[in-house]
Every structure is written in C-alpha cells, then in structure tokens.
From Swiss-Prot:
It comes from Saccharomyces cerevisiae (strain ATCC 204508 / S288c) (Baker's yeast). This is F(1)-ATPase inhibitor STF1, mitochondrial. Transmembrane segments: none annotated. InterPro entries: ATPase_inhibitor_mt. The modification Phosphoserine is found at residue 24. GO terms for cellular component: mitochondrion. One of its GO terms (molecular function) is ATPase binding.
Length: 86
C-alpha cells in the first residue's frame, strides 16, 4: 500500500499535446505569387536597383569626363615635349 502511494505521488502529469511551429511557404506568408507584400518587396527591389544603376551611370560619366580632361592634358604635354625636342 505504501508502495502505491509513493508511485502515485511521484508521477508527473503528462501532457500529450506537443507544441510545434508552423512555417509559411515563403518569407512573408504562404499566400502565393499574388501576395501583396511580395509585390511590394519586388517593387522596392526594382526601385533600389534602378537607383543603384543611376548612381553607377553618373559615376561612369564623371570618370569618362575626367579621362577626357587627362587625355587633353597628356596631348598638350606631348606636344610641348615634341616642340622642345625639335
């Protein structure tokens, strides 16, 4: 009898429910390809890419302009050297 009382008191309650996480199919929910958040992300990414390309174009134009100026300076210096060597 004492053995039964001890074993009943030492048992821990067992919960048969198991916690589990459910993940969506995509990063913003599994609403599929028409998900408005997904469209927003694509639009933002396109705007950022456009901005980056514009910045690169401006930098490239600036570098090309500098290259033209340096070529002119180089040509002038070469002409001076040629005139002095004659």
């Amino acid at each position: 009898m004492l053995n039964r009382c001890i074993s009943r008191n030492t048992r821990l309650p067992v919960n048969l429910r198991i916690a589990s996480r459910f993940y969506s199919d995509g990063p913003l929910g599994g609403a599929g390809p028409g998900n408005p958040q997904d469209i927003f992300i694509k639009r933002e990414r396109a705007k950022e890419d456009y901005y980056a390309r514009q910045q690169e174009r401006e930098q490239l134009a600036h570098v090309k302009e500098q290259l033209k100026e340096h070529k002119k300076k180089l040509e002038n210096l070469e002409n001076k050297i040629n005139n002095l060597s004659k």
